[in-house]
Amino acid sequence: MGIGEAIAKIFAGAGASVVLLARDAERTEAARTRIGHVERTLALACDVRNREEIDRVVSLTLHHFNRIDVWINNAGHGMLDSVTNVDMAACRETFETNFFGALGAMQAVIPVMKQQGSGTIINISSVAGHIPLPFHAVYSATKFAMNAIGKGARIELKDSGINVTTVCPGYVRTAFGANAVKGTDQKQVRPASVRGISVERVANAVLQGYLKGKREVVVPWTMHPMIKLYQLFPGLVEWSMVKMAREGL
């Protein structure tokens, strides 16, 4: 189970009507079945790189449920390669999915929420949007962009009754890494001892962040000091990453 399904499950369990989106229609329907609450869930195929598809699912959601109270941008994939060797076409595709897809969805749903007078947009970003990761620099760049667009939109929309929350998980135990686009220059900069957190923990943090109207949610909490450490002493964090890359940990 990935982060998206875990979020859908916890929101459905809390009583929300939920629409699940993914490129693969069969995969989305299977997730809907596992989540349950089929009387108030909907599974739709959508490629967020295509604005017309986003507009279509927004219209279908309004047709079925009359309003959109929460929109969660979670589509994305990793990319593992060095800045020197990264394939530019793959780089652009990663930005199309991870960043421009989220931006397009925000532009599609904001007018709906403005008309309602309320709504929440939740962008699933990453700690990598605070601390750039070597050999994951393109992925980090998409998350830095996601952090900026979410926090900027939060200020712009403050008087519209629309809240924007940015969620930054650390390492999560999913197939995300295995499904990442891999180039020719790959090195590990995460110690093998780091197990990561569960998707259920991320989903609960998302729900609590929504209920509390948070500006940003970092999960696990232990990532907060790491982010502050990088902000205050970037050289120290960079040194540790260079050491891990050299040792191939």
Where are these regions (language model features)?
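Active-site helix of classical SDR
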Residues: 106, 142
